[in-house]
Regions:
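Solvent-exposed beta-hairpin/edge-strand motifs
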Residues: 462-483
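Noncatalytic carbohydrate-binding groove/subsite architecture in carbohydrate-active enzymes
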Residues: 180, 191-199, 225-357, 364, ...
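C-terminal outer-membrane/trafficking sorting elements
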Residues: 7-10, 517-589
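N-terminal catalytic cores of secreted or lumenal carbohydrate-active enzymes
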Residues: 19-282
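C-terminal beta-strand-rich structural cap/linker in extracellular carbohydrate-active enzymes
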Residues: 488-512, 574
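Aromatic/acidic polysaccharide-binding cleft in carbohydrate-active enzymes
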Residues: 325-431
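Bacterial Sec-dependent N-terminal signal peptides
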Residues: 1-21, 513-517, 582
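Carbohydrate-binding surface patches
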Residues: 425-465, 502-506
Length: 589
């Protein structure tokens, strides 16, 4: 009996310590996210150039728009593909009109800092912010402006709403669009003040051409309208005249609406907005939820957010809308949070969660861009750059952006994961995504083992035309560590890799083709997206002639150009054929 019991214990321990397995199959010809560079957006706090009570900067910038010396080595080379503004400023009454004008020191004071600093002129204002984005190489079309939606003439139910309120809010928002986008030719589309002329006098004669405008920040929060459908109806009532006013100034802009992150079902903000007159009349461009996952709860895990957002992205696509992830970061549910609570969201634990989240988001072909919350204030609760005890630190979650941005190539492609479940009951232990260059000459695979206990054996399939160039593991010594360790690794005899718990495997491949194949491929190569398609299938280049057939080889339609309308095709499998290519796609009505 004792022998049998000992054998049972040995078998049990061997199972507990068994190495888990994960397999990834890649289809480089099937695009998921058309521009995966937009995974690396950030939200920027408009108060970043203001001074604290001791007269020193509380943010990243001096009032003149230069980075403070301590921030230069941390942030001057930081990768930013898209940005959201004014961040936390919107919650404390930031007024863009008071943030423009020269000299900057003569601008009216704004009280935006609470106990962090006195009322003062916002010298690093809207124009200075736009100059910074230009210096970073960003197009104004990749700036996402958050506008206040509360009018100070109304007595709002909550002091948080009242704190955001500004005078004559409808005109205020319309004036901002005119200042940003109207040509300086006397057209003055809003009448009254010629804001384009004022912009020109402030040193920027040409219109910025900002496309993305979001209505509010988190209007679904309990201290604003609340997460009920009645709250959503109130939100829609408030923003409709604002939307009409700003579209009258510039009909080409793209308007996004905030929505509750994890609402599911028919009686939700998601459903209410998607079925609203604003959506039906084409006045809005997309929905913009926020995500603050934590792995400690069953409904707050990254996997839960990815599942919900996958469904939401598909629902948006059915209504002809996009999804933009306004903000995300590791959640900090503790109230009030300790310094350790704040830090771990930015340390290695928060980094693993963030990479897991980004890999999940990269597979949503109707997701346009993602922003991290929040940059600009190193003493804030969420601080990817931290100021503590007189020291500025680039936290691991920000270090990881610097490491991953060059590796996330032009498109994410279809990556099918088969992973053992996590030791905590998560549906997977390892999450993987793959990224290719425009001409398919490069392929990078990023696999994150988000499990805190299990090691995984990892295998990649679908890469027979690629040669491995580099392989490394990114890891740390503990969830609260702030140093990222890079280790060069090699596959085992079977071509498999080992991914330790809470670590990231990066594989870099180059295409293995001869010179003739290389030239031929560059000439003939193109990609199709989204796949599955609903109403339209896009091509990454203009085609002189193409034919669409069903899976029996029967011709369904033909044409030329950079897209094909697919709304009238029945759900199923189809093939797009050109002289040199044949690509499979699905219709998913």
């Amino acid at each position: 009996m004792k022998t049998k019991f000992t054998l049972f214990i040995c078998l049990l321990l061997s199972q507990l310590n068994a190495q888990q397995t994960s397999t990834t199959t890649i289809d480089v010809n099937s695009v998921q996210m058309p521009n995966s560079k937009f995974l690396f957006g950030i939200t920027m706090d408009s108060r970043t150039g203001m001074l604290g009570t001791n007269g020193t900067s509380i943010g990243y910038f001096n009032p003149d728009g230069t980075l403070i010396p301590e921030i230069v080595p941390l942030f001057s080379d930081f990768p930013v593909s898209t940005t959201r503004y004014p961040g936390n400023g919107i919650g404390v009454g930031y007024d863009w009109k008071k943030s423009i004008g020269l000299p900057a020191s003569s601008r009216p004071n704004q009280s935006l800092l609470g106990n962090l600093g006195p009322a003062q002129a916002v010298e690093f204002g809207f124009d200075e912010f736009m100059s910074w984005t230009a210096a970073k190489g960003m197009s104004p079309q990749d700036v996402h402006i958050m506008v206040s939606i509360y009018d100070s003439a109304t007595v709002w139910a909550d002091q948080i709403q009242q704190r955001q309120a500004l005078p004559n809010i409808i005109q205020h928002c319309a004036d901002w669009v005119e200042y940003a986008n109207a040509p300086n030719n006397g057209s003055n589309p809003g009448g009254g003040t010629d804001w384009a002329a004022i912009r020109s006098a402030n040193g920027h004669d040409s219109p910025y051409g900002i496309k993305l405008w979001n209505m509010g920040n988190e209007p679904w929060a309990s201290h604003e309208f609340g997460a009920t459908t009645a709250g959503c109806d109130s939100y829609l009532t408030v923003i409709t005249p604002i939307i009409d006013a700003i579209l009258a100034i510039d009909p080409s802009i793209h308007i996004t609406l905030a929505t509750v992150g994890t609402n599911v079902g028919p009686n939700t903000w998601h459903s209410r907005i998607l079925n609203s007159p604003l959506a039906a009349t084409g006045k809005i461009y997309g929905l913009s939820p926020h995500a603050f996952p934590v792995e400690s709860g069953s409904n707050t895990k990254v996997s839960n957010f990815v599942s919900i957002y996958s469904d939401l992205a598909d629902s948006c696509q059915v209504h002809g809308l996009k999804m933009i992830l306004g903000d995300y970061a590791h959640g900090i549910p503790q109230t009030p949070p300790s310094q350790a609570d704040k830090d771990i969201a930015m340390q290695w634990q928060g980094t693993i969660l963030s990479v897991d989240f980004l890999m999940g988001m990269s597979k949503l072909n109707n997701l346009e861009r993602v922003n991290f919350w929040v940059y600009g204030m190193p003493s804030a609760v969420w601080h990817p750059i931290r100021f503590l005890n007189g020291v500025y630190t680039l936290m691991p979650v920000a270090q990881m952006y610097k490491k991953l941005a060059p590796l996330v190539l032009d498109h994410s492609v279809q990556t099918t994961n088969t992973s053992s479940p996590g030791s905590d009951g998560n549906p997977y232990g390892v999450n993987t995504s793959s990224f290719v260059s425009n001409n398919l000459s490069q392929l990078n695979v990023i696999a994150v083992n988000r499990d805190s206990i299990d090691t995984h054996t990892f295998q990649v399939a679908g890469i027979s035309n690629y040669d491995l160039q580099n392989a490394k593991i990114l890891s740390s010594t503990a969830p609260s560590d702030e140093v990222i360790i890079e280790t060069i690794v090699s596959p085992d005899a079977n071509g498999n890799f080992t991914i330790p718990p809470m670590s990231i495997l990066i594989l870099e491949y180059n295409e293995s083709v001869n010179e003739f194949q290389s030239h031929t491929k560059k000439d003939n190569y193109f990609m199709i997206y989204p796949n599955p398609a609903n109403d339209i299938l896009n091509f990454s280049k203009n085609l002189q002639e193409f034919i669409v057939t069903n899976n029996l080889g029967q011709e369904i339609l033909k044409g030329k150009g950079n897209s094909v309308a697919t709304a009238n095709l029945k759900a199923g499998i189809y093939f797009l054929k050109t002289e040199n290519s044949c690509l499979r796609f699905n219709i998913g009505h």
